[in-house]
Amino acid sequence: MDRVLGCVFAGAVHDYFSGMLSVRNGGASVPNLTGKYLGAPVKHFMNALALVLLVLVGVVFVISPAGLLTNLTMDNLGESMNLDRGHTLVVWTTVIFLYYIIATLIPIDKIIGRVYPLFGALLLFMSFGMFFALLFEDKALFHSVGEMSFSKFFENLHPTGLPIWPLIFVTIACGAVSGFHATQSPLMARCMENEKEGRFVFYGAMIGEGIIALIWCMVGLTFYNSPAEMNEAINMGTPSKVVYDSATQMLGYFGGILAVLGVVVLPITSGDTSFRAARLIIAEFFKIDQKNLVKRLMIAVPLFVVGFIITKLDFQVLWRYFGWANQTTAMVMLWTAAAYLYRYHKFHWICTIPAIFMTMVSATFLAYAKIGFGLAYDTAVWVGVGLTALATVCFFTMLKPIADGDPDSETNPA
């Protein structure tokens, strides 16, 4: 339920406005947009936050596809070629990193633009394949869903009893709302030929991602007999094990391999552009021209060194940091879009309400989580409520609608 509502009313709205504001401002990056509509202090905060997020995206989206490809390799070639799992994982991690380096340095139409049609085909096969497998698989896959009532959607089924609020809204960091998408909007905005494409490119793409997320949510609910059983599978490796086991068992050997490759596409198509966007943000901040390959390497090499070091950390911890940074970026972008609508006398609540909600999610998570301040749950919730109220008051008191006839209103078509 949270994926559906979040995707339609928050995630897709977030993606649409981040994209269209970038289009209206000549392909401007998220930090520049936040600086224009929320002020310089927010721009500096967003520069740092976006950079952290992009590096974390690149790292977590190396680990998960490398794990899936390692499982494929070991199951098919491991015994016959006497392969070591650890060494195989290092090889795939290195291969993915090398691809990211090339994609970061080479113009977007030379590498990414050429391989994305193939990636898209794999993604479509994975999505439709898993969906129809859920419908027509012989075994009773829907046993756990069939027993659910509406009230059970609000029942906490976490094996260790962790609170639903706000953790679920940070754990589901991409299928409902994703601040990472805002960092990629300039790449798409600069490629668009007509503003009319925005609804399909930005809003529609997020709805598509939400559908894929729902398909895998159903797989998680039905493939395992209980949340505890799925959690045990995750603890044996990473979430990639759940993907691999379910795909190969539900679609057979060949279909499962194609589905796994389709899932591999998802993180790789995020990771390859994340380091590129990080390079561009740094170059923009320090005003380093990027036409020269040497100057690109000056930024890219340190980024990849830092990223490779971070891959050695625990995946679960990395995912929590990524989730928080992702949702906090979305929060700031939603406030930015709300500020644009509010200042130009538009119906701002379509962005303001999601912004308020995401502020409470991010603030409460940071206050409660062990990777944050580790406060008691009740205290953390009240901290989240207080900070959200403060942000809302600041929004309406510090921002002023632009008066009719103001010269700025003519340079920003409403």
Regions found by a protein language model. Name each.
Residues 5, 13-42, 77, 190, ...:
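Flexible loop linkers connecting adjacent transmembrane helices
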Residues 6, 10-26, 30-104, 133, ...:
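Helix-loop-helix module between adjacent transmembrane segments
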Residues 19, 134-151, 203-245:
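Extracellular/periplasmic helix-exit of transmembrane alpha-helices
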Residues 40-47, 51, 85-95, 204-213, ...:
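Loop-to-transmembrane helix boundary motifs in multi-pass membrane proteins
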Residues 58-75, 79, 87-94, 99-104, ...:
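Hydrophobic alpha-helical segments and their helix-loop junctions in multi-pass secondary transporters
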Residues 85-89, 94, 108, 112-119, ...:
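C-terminal membrane-solvent junction of multi-pass transporters and transport-like membrane proteins
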Residues 98, 127, 304-309, 384-397:
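Hydrophobic core of alpha-helical transmembrane segments in multi-pass integral membrane proteins
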Residues 131-139, 152-216, 261-270:
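Hydrophobic, membrane-embedded alpha-helices of multi-pass small-molecule transporters
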